[in-house]
Amino acid sequence: MELAVVWSVLVAQTMLALAMAFALYRMARGPRAQDRILGLDTLYINAMLMLITFGIRTANTVYFETALIIAVIGFASSIALAKFLMRGEVIE
């Protein structure tokens, strides 16, 4: 792999780790439940992107498949949490 790609991936991983720390802070300190859910959504998206950058760095497809699973589970949990906040129940 070219040196520019390696450095780009390392910079991206560093920025994603920083974004994950900020999202974790928002999730822990959010004054409302909506802020905590937003922090959780941001955290799973950043985790998914971190796995994709690991996949690029190692040229291993397992990371891409894991990122896809995280995306599907994160989307379903976001919908369930939003429905719970609006109606107070998830299953009707």
Swiss-Prot record:
| Topology of this chain in the membrane | Multi-pass membrane protein
Q: Quote the subcellular location field of this record.
A: Cell membrane
Q: Which GO terms describe its cellular component?
A: plasma membrane
Would you say which domain of life the source belongs to?
A: Bacteria
Query: What are the GO BP annotations of this UniProt entry?
Result: potassium ion transport
- Gene Ontology molecular-function annotations: sodium:proton antiporter activity
**Keyword field:** Antiport, Cell membrane, Hydrogen ion transport, Ion transport, Membrane, Potassium, Potassium transport, Transmembrane, Transmembrane helix, Transport
Q: What is its main location?
A: membrane
**Pfam families hit by this protein:** MrpF_PhaF
Segments traversing the membrane:
4-24, 36-56, 62-82
Family under the similarity heading: Belongs to the CPA3 antiporters (TC 2.A.63) subunit F family.
* Assembly and oligomerization: May form a hetero-oligomeric complex that consists of six subunits: PhaAB, PhaC, PhaD, PhaE, PhaF and PhaG.
Q: What does this protein do?
A: Part of a K(+) efflux system which is required for the adaptation of R.meliloti to alkaline pH as well as for the infection process during symbiotic nodule development.
What name does this protein carry? Probable K(+)/H(+) antiporter subunit F
**Organism encoding this protein:** Rhizobium meliloti (strain 1021)
Please spell out the taxonomic lineage of the organism that makes this protein: Bacteria, Pseudomonadati, Pseudomonadota, Alphaproteobacteria, Hyphomicrobiales
Q: Which gene encodes it?
A: phaF
